[in-house]
């Protein structure tokens, strides 16, 4: 059975499934660079619009049209046979991609080319995550999705899209566990190709719990950590993320892992 995957946009992103609302999560800062675009394209302007980087066109767009060229990766390696979609409109709460859409599929090098689309502003550029209903935004360094400015007779060179799995196994605390406030051990299974990990423990303030910000995105080189400060009584949600040596996120633990401090 193929492992379920989720999507990634750099720094913070929205995870979406077709026909459903999105939920915001944190992720890694990618250090990878595409062979046919520069990192300049990954940063939006003050209007939230990403402009094309420079690169070598695979082919020229038809007169008056635009092409979109980019790459999809997993673990800093090409991800072939991935469906990519350019969306005229995007609503993260009402089904995602809307309006005119244009599609392509990545080749053996993880590269794609969406050909001959009308120029203008598009609200999403997504890559389907293998055989799951999830997809990723081609964005970097900011919150959420972005808009993309496609110019007539030009190829838009998009930021890399980096995929990650959601199969990192959290060993303790176990989901639904009730634990004492002192000496809580966070432990997880080693993940293939992971160079380091980050864990976050978020409080449900309605339960009386309080977030200790020392335990948000805390980097750990091993696979366990004993909290050096007690947690207040209440309910908490824990996530663990794995990163490779290029600071690219590989995987996260399931997002429904909660425990209670007695």
Task: Place the predicted regions along the sequence by residue.
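Long luminal/extracellular ectodomains of secretory-pathway precursor proteins
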Residues: 23-262
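Hydrophobic helical h-region of N-terminal Sec-dependent signal peptides
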Residues: 9-13
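C-terminal motif of bacterial Sec signal peptides marking the signal peptidase cleavage site
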Residues: 18-21
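Bacterial N-terminal signal peptides that target proteins for export
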Residues: 1-8
């Amino acid at each position: 059975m193929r492992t379920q995957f989720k999507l990634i946009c750099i720094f913070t992103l929205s995870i979406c499934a077709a026909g459903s609302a999105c939920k915001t999560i944190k992720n890694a800062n990618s250090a990878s660079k595409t062979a046919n675009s520069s990192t300049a394209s990954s940063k939006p302007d003050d209007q939230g619009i990403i402009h094309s980087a420079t690169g070598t066109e695979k082919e020229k767009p038809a007169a008056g049209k635009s092409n979109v060229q980019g790459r999809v990766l997993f673990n800093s390696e090409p991800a072939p046979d991935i469906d990519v979609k350019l969306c005229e409109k995007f609503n993260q709460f009402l089904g995602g991609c809307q309006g005119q859409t244009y599609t392509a599929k990545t080749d053996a090098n993880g590269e794609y080319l969406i050909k001959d689309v009308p120029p203008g502003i598009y609200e999403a550029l997504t890559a389907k995550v293998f055989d799951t209903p999830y997809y990723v935004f081609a964005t970097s360094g900011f919150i959420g999705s972005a808009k993309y400015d496609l110019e007539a007779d030009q190829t838009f060179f998009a930021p890399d899209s980096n995929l990650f799995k959601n199969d990192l196994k959290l060993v303790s605390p176990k989901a639904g566990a009730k634990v004492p406030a002192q000496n809580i051990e966070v432990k997880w299974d080693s993940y293939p190709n992971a160079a380091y990990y980050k864990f976050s423990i978020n409080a449900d303030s309605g339960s009386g719990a309080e977030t200790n910000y020392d335990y948000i995105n805390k980097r750990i080189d091993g696979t366990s950590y004993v909290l050096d400060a007690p947690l207040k009584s209440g309910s908490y949600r824990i996530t663990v993320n794995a990163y490779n040596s290029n600071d690219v996120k590989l995987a996260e633990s399931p997002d429904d892992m909660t425990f209670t401090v007695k």
